[in-house]
């Protein structure tokens, strides 16, 4: 792995980081795959889709090439539960706010997330990378 980064951390910190790096991403994508698998008009969905959906679908499909046993091991990380519960709470919060017409709460949630993540990431650069990635693999 010539591009690999090696970091020395204790086992607890490792499990916490891997819960986000692999656990949360695998959990989200396995569930997304299950939803896509139930779409009886997937070709229409794909035809209507844009950059975000295409990128997510590729990631989801790629994860499904891994063995179910490996995915199960990744999802068995005990540290994942805390992040999954936070994800579930936030999904509920956002859906409730949208259904109750509380756009200001949703917008504030998005702005707050954007502000915090922007401290470490150039979001415009990330969007350009996404566009470049999708454009390079169009079939």
Each predicted region: which residue ranges?
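Short beta-strand and adjoining strand-loop segment in the mid-core
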Residues: 1-6
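An accessory alpha-helical subdomain
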Residues: 8-138
């Amino acid at each position: 792995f010539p591009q690999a980064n090696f970091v020395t951390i204790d086992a607890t910190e490792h499990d916490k980081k891997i819960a986000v790096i692999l656990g949360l991403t695998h959990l989200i994508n396995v569930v997304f795959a299950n939803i896509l698998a139930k779409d009886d008009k997937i070709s229409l969905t794909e035809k209507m889709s844009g950059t975000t959906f295409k990128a997510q679908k590729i990631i989801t499909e790629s994860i499904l090439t891994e063995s179910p046993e490996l995915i199960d091991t990744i999802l068995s990380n005990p540290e994942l539960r805390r992040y999954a519960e936070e994800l579930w709470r936030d999904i509920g919060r956002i859906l409730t706010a949208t259904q109750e017409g509380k756009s200001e709460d949703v917008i504030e949630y998005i702005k707050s997330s954007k502000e915090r993540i922007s401290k470490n990431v150039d979001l415009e650069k990330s969007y350009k990378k996404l566009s470049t990635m999708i454009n390079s693999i169009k079939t």
